[in-house]
Amino acid sequence: MQRLAMDLRVLSRELALYLEHQVRVGFFGSGVGLSLILGFSVAYACYYLSSIAKKPQLVIGGESFSRFLQDHCPVVTETYYPTVWCWESRGQTLLRPFITSKPPVQYRNELIKTADGGQISLDWFDNNNSAYYVDASTRPTILLLPGLTGTSKESYILHMIHLSEELGYRCVVFNNRGVAGESLLTPRTYCCANTEDLEAVVHHVHSLYPGAPFLAAGVSMGGMLLLNYLGKIGSKTPLMAAATFSVGWNTFACSESLERPLNWLLFNYYLTTCLQSSVKKHRHMFVEQIDMDQVMKAKSIREFDKRFTAVMFGYRTLDDYYTDASPNRRLKSVGIPVLCLNATDDVFSPSHAIPIETAKQNPNVALVLTAYGGHIGFLEGIWPRQCTYMDRVFKQFVQAMVEHGHELSNM
């Protein structure tokens, strides 16, 4: 019995020494394991550098605008390196709202009245401590338009404001009716085809600071609205330039892409519930003209638009609304310099619907098309908490237009 106990102790000690050795050496200490790790790392790095990290495709209608961007907005000619562990479209799209920081911004709210008796909520960042533009009357103003159900609290809006603050600029965020907590005074919300509210906001802001450089930037649906406005008004706008990000160019193609099973599960259904939530709190305003019970049963953005948006804005059919809402139709009429950043892997805006040929025919338009980036993603760096590629494009472009925009008229 004593012998057996001694043998067990010896066996236990030997086993413990063996396990300790394995822990110390581990997988990485194994020649085979280390070779596998190194081999995989080299193969992945080669794949990433050859197939993922690429320079954007530039589609610019005019030689003057092309030279201007190369000289003053070089980021659009540089290789975009998506986050190495998250470069796929859906991953970038889903991760950005959760991983990017939210710089603190103190707003001043203003409610302006509309011709139909409604009101629009504007959130101002006045930047009164600007060291570069002490005189408020000439301080550059950037009008920011958030996405579908977005407000001034979105992280991408906060980052644009933070970058504008560094440049000394003032910002104002255009919150669509009823989404920012303000009361809805009339039975009307918003859509990207109807530009009346945006026209009122542009006129109002310009009337306050007529001597200040005035630019606009729109994200997703905000960019669609901005492009539709510019396409309708041409060069007769107080805006000197504009930028759009992750715009859906063809509403039919966007809807079809978002209705594919995985995209519907990840994005479409959630956004539909957000739209329903935004109108539910104002339900009493719509009951006379819209069947709200059917609206609340919608399972997709298309169904919501058919039962609510198209009806509210007087379209005969959903197809009529989607045709009018698609900014690709009006791109040829844009009359001021506009930079449009899209990722060709964006499931919200499929690449085949990007109006490349139309852009080539308008000297005021520049399309910047990255291979990756998703929808309002454009994450870069190992831990993409701070600035994205989209942010860098925004900052360089607005600075270029404010400081060197006069060169375009001389080219």
From Swiss-Prot:
Phospholipase that may play a role in phospholipids remodeling. May selectively cleave myristate (C14)-containing phosphatidylcholines through its predominant phospholipase 1 activity, cleaving preferentially acyl groups in sn1 position. In parallel, may have a minor phospholipase 2 activity acting on acyl groups in position sn2. In addition to (C14)-containing phosphatidylcholines, may also act on other medium-chain-containing and oxidatively truncated phospholipids. Residues 140-233 form the AB hydrolase-1 domain. Belongs to the AB hydrolase superfamily. AB hydrolase 4 family. It catalyses: a 1,2-diacyl-sn-glycero-3-phosphocholine + H2O = a 1-acyl-sn-glycero-3-phosphocholine + a fatty acid + H(+); a 1,2-diacyl-sn-glycero-3-phosphocholine + H2O = a 2-acyl-sn-glycero-3-phosphocholine + a fatty acid + H(+); 1-tetradecanoyl-2-(9Z,12Z-octadecadienoyl)-sn-glycero-3-phosphocholine + H2O = 2-(9Z,12Z-octadecadienoyl)-sn-glycero-3-phosphocholine + tetradecanoate + H(+); 1-tetradecanoyl-2-(9Z,12Z-octadecadienoyl)-sn-glycero-3-phosphocholine + H2O = 1-tetradecanoyl-sn-glycero-3-phosphocholine + (9Z,12Z)-octadecadienoate + H(+). GO terms for cellular component: membrane. Keywords: Hydrolase, Lipid metabolism, Membrane, Phospholipid metabolism, Serine esterase, Signal-anchor, Transmembrane, Transmembrane helix. The active site is at residues 220, 346, 375. The lineage of its organism: Eukaryota, Metazoa, Chordata, Craniata, Vertebrata. This is Phospholipase ABHD3. It is a single-pass type II membrane protein. It comes from the Eukaryota. SUPFAM superfamilies: alpha/beta-Hydrolases.
